[in-house]
């Protein structure tokens, strides 16, 4: 029999976070803990369907007027409009001036990809693959892949995490922006930076915006955790809204996976802020062409759940309460873990655990210590030392804290 025409195809390495979860599932040890999963978990370690989502799903199922016809190519209009409103604010002048457009995407990744595909085709000259794209060091690993696969050839990093002080390297970040070529694209985490959990303060964001404006750099925000970081939708959108108020044209990729718990519905939105309505409409016309050959038409269920919730004052209030429940549990786990590590006298400082916000924490554990945690203690976390605070529960906190203490004291 002739060899397969695919015989020369190399096997791609597995996606790290999904491989980690697979390894966790196969582990038969009763003490095992999964701190790698990128999703919310209850104190029982279980997925949580938001009560408001259950309620809206029942409303949708009972609505005889709904059908399964195609949506518009750019997505469900009431979802797109309200998603952008959540990002930019009820009183957004940009929305009032009709210079905001949006595209429904397949989750935050889909929103990022449509933005990247458009920028490669039309930003800084037609089909300019040489425009530098800057991602934070470190960043969510998919940022690199999305922009590379969209055709950008020059992906660079800007300094962000200061390992020595376990916090933001503001001066390094600003210096890298000063040195970046004009019209470079900068991927900015709107809140709850992944993986570090370390965000700039409002004053630091102002300094970042000032440099970006002077250097003519393009802001592309990734907003995956609005409401989940601090418990406040407005506080978590502060940076995006400030940049808009400063006159920036920008993109903002939004994900509703975390704050609605709709991970497998793939609900995302790309908000486009332009100088005027005409510019935005021309951008959307090109994005429509890109969507047509990418997924052609988005799914409706998740978008309908979000739109129904955001347009009802009662459901919106209930959703905010659900989001705060998740955010508060994360804050509690941060406080409890830090307290236990300090009580154990674990070497180093641990205030960064409570200084950071959002689902993830950059522990500061090195790869050898991480390996020890996985192999000896059956506690699964990313090689970078990133942990998902939602993987902690009142039942496993003591075990995790003692294991971190052991790893830090035994392994250098």
From Swiss-Prot:
Enzyme class: transferase
Residues where N6-(pyridoxal phosphate)lysine is found: 258
Function, in words: Biosynthesis of L-glutamate from L-aspartate or L-cysteine. Important regulator of levels of glutamate, the major excitatory neurotransmitter of the vertebrate central nervous system. Acts as a scavenger of glutamate in brain neuroprotection. The aspartate aminotransferase activity is involved in hepatic glucose synthesis during development and in adipocyte glyceroneogenesis. Using L-cysteine as substrate, regulates levels of mercaptopyruvate, an important source of hydrogen sulfide. Mercaptopyruvate is converted into H(2)S via the action of 3-mercaptopyruvate sulfurtransferase (3MST).
The protein's name in its UniProt record: Aspartate aminotransferase, cytoplasmic
Name of encoding gene: GOT1
Alphabetized CDD domains for the sequence: AAT_like
Record EC number: 2.6.1.1, 2.6.1.3
Gene Ontology biological process terms from the UniProt entry: 2-oxoglutarate metabolic process; aspartate biosynthetic process; aspartate catabolic process; aspartate metabolic process; cellular response to insulin stimulus; fatty acid homeostasis; gluconeogenesis; glutamate catabolic process to aspartate
Lineage of the organism: Eukaryota, Metazoa, Chordata, Craniata, Vertebrata
Cofactors named for this entry: pyridoxal 5'-phosphate
Signal peptide location: none
Similarity annotation: Belongs to the class-I pyridoxal-phosphate-dependent aminotransferase family.
Note: In eukaryotes there are cytoplasmic, mitochondrial and chloroplastic isozymes.
Quaternary context: Homodimer.
Reactions performed catalytically: L-aspartate + 2-oxoglutarate = oxaloacetate + L-glutamate; L-cysteine + 2-oxoglutarate = 2-oxo-3-sulfanylpropanoate + L-glutamate; (2S)-2-aminobutanoate + 2-oxoglutarate = 2-oxobutanoate + L-glutamate; 3-sulfino-L-alanine + 2-oxoglutarate = 3-sulfinopyruvate + L-glutamate
Matching NCBIfam families: PRK09257.1
List of residues that carry N-acetylalanine: 2
GO cellular component, one term: cytosol
Residue positions binding L-aspartate: 38, 140, 194, 386
């Amino acid at each position: 029999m002739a060899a397969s025409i695919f015989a020369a195809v190399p096997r791609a390495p597995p996606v790290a976070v999904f491989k980690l979860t697979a390894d966790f599932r196969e582990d038969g040890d009763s003490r095992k803990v999964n701190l790698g999963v990128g999703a919310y978990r209850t104190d029982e370690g279980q997925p949580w369907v938001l009560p408001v989502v259950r309620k809206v799903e029942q409303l949708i199922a009972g609505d005889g007027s709904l059908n399964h016809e195609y949506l518009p190519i750019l997505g469900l209009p009431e979802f797109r409009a309200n998603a952008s409103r959540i990002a930019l604010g009820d009183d957004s002048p940009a929305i009032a001036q009709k210079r905001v457009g949006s595209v429904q995407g397949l989750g935050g990744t889909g929103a990022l990809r449509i933005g990247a595909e458009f920028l490669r085709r039309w930003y800084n000259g037609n089909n300019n693959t040489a425009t530098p794209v800057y991602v934070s060091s470190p960043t969510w690993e998919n940022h690199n892949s999305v922009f590379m696969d969209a055709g950008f050839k020059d992906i660079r990093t800007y300094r962000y995490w200061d390992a020595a002080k376990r916090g933001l390297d503001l001066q390094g970040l600003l210096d890298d922006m000063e040195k970046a070529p004009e019209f470079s694209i900068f991927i900015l985490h709107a809140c709850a930076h992944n993986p570090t959990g370390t965000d700039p303060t409002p004053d630091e964001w102002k300094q970042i915006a000032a440099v970006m404006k002077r250097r003519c750099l393009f802001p592309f925000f990734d907003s995956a955790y609005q409401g989940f970081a601090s418990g406040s939708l407005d506080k978590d959108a502060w940076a995006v809204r400030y940049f808009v108020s400063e006159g920036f044209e920008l993109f903002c990729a939004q994900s509703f996976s975390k704050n609605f718990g709709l991970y497998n519905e793939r609900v995302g939105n790309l908000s486009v802020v332009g100088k005027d309505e005409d510019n935005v409409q021309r951008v959307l016309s090109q994005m429509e062409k890109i969507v047509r050959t990418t997924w052609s038409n988005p799914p409706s269920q998740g978008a309908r759940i979000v739109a129904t919730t955001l347009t009802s004052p009662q459901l919106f209030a209930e959703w905010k309460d659900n989001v705060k429940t998740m955010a508060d549990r994360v804050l509690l786990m941060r406080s409890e873990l830090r307290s236990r590590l300090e009580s154990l006298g674990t070497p180093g400082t641990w205030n960064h655990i409570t200084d950071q916000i959002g689902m993830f924490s950059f522990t500061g554990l090195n790869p050898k210590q991480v390996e020890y945690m996985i192999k000896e203690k059956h506690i699964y976390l990313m090689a970078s030392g990133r942990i998902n605070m939602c993987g902690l529960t009142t039942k496993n906190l003591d075990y995790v804290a003692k294991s971190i203490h052991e790893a830090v004291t035994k392994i250098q």
